[in-house]
UniProtKB/Swiss-Prot annotation:
Residues 74-93 bind DNA. GO terms for molecular function: DNA-binding transcription factor activity; sequence-specific DNA binding. This is DNA-binding protein Fis. HAMAP family: DNA_binding_Fis (MF_00166). It holds the Pfam family HTH_8. Belongs to the transcriptional regulatory Fis family. Homodimer. Activates ribosomal RNA transcription. Plays a direct role in upstream activation of rRNA promoters. Keywords: Activator, DNA-binding, Transcription, Transcription regulation.
């Protein structure tokens, strides 16, 4: 039987607005803004491997924080991430983390 996952709020990033008030924005909005800024600064050139660039900018710190949270326990980290341990080990190696 499928296990129901608890409803989770989207990941948010706390930011300060112009009035120095804390504002929580969904992570996806920050990613959209970062990609928008990146594309705007290309001076008309088309990027290559944009998908890999964005993915690595998100994946590396996520793996780092999950590994810290699990105190290096790869089995627990893989379970938290919803991937198998072999895939986790491959990703850790890719980023020089394992």
């Amino acid at each position: 039987m499928l296990e129901q996952q608890p409803t989770q709020n989207p990941l948010t990033v706390s930011m300060l607005n112009a009035q120095a008030q804390q504002v929580d924005r969904p992570l996806r909005e920050n990613v959209k803004q970062a990609v928008r800024n990146y594309l705007r600064n290309l001076d008309g050139q088309d990027p290559t491997e944009l998908y890999e660039l964005v993915l690595s900018e998100i994946e590396h710190p996520m793996l780092d924080m999950v590994m810290q949270h699990t105190r290096g326990n790869q089995t627990r980290a893989a379970t938290m991430l919803g991937i198998n341990r072999g895939t986790l080990r491959k990703k850790l190696k890719k980023y020089g983390m394992g």
